Amino acid sequence: MTQDKQARNASHDAAADALGALLDEGKTVVFLTLGAPTVYSTYWYVHKRVAARGYAAELVPGVPSFCAAAAAMGRALCEDGEMLHIIPATHGRAEEGPALPGRTALMKTGKSVLEVRHLLRQRGEPGSAALLPTVGYDGQRLHKHTTE
């Protein structure tokens, strides 16, 4: 994914154009996505465009990756009134999560995983986080601590 907003918008427009063309042919179209289509999903941007053009577009809920990751680890995301913060680690925002009270799920950590590890070490909490870079995929890997 590019950080260039113009390029992203152009890509979303092109996807909506392609879907619209298929719908105009009377075809039924499915846009399958991993996780939930309403949580940091490319699909949401395409959905808005397709719906704005007057097409019927249905959202089918999925399992967000942070929920799938917690289940794979056998952990609760939060308990006893703890706050849960879902933070995208993109765009240099990784440091926001660990500073908040409660629990944090950092999403999209691929390019910032070393930054997250450094932040946790600075806070004296290097073993307090787990990483599932391939949650939901065949052969998903679980790193119980970010020190791995």
Report residues per predicted region.
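A contiguous loop/helix-start segment that scaffolds small-molecule binding in enzyme catalytic cores
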Residues: R8, D24-V29, P98-E148
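Class I S-adenosyl-L-methionine
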Residues: M1-A56
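Structural motif corresponding to alpha-helix initiation and N-cap regions
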Residues: D13-A16, H91-G92, V113
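A short acidic, often aromatic-flanked loop/helix-cap motif at beta-alpha or helix-coil junctions
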Residues: M1-Q6, G92-A94, Y137-G139
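Predominant activation on well-ordered alpha-helical scaffold segments within soluble catalytic domains
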Residues: G20, W44-H47, C67-A70, L114-R121
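Pocket-edge structural micro-motifs
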Residues: T33, P88, P133
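Class I SAM-dependent methyltransferase SAM-binding "motif I" and its flanking Rossmann-like core
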Residues: E25, T38-L100
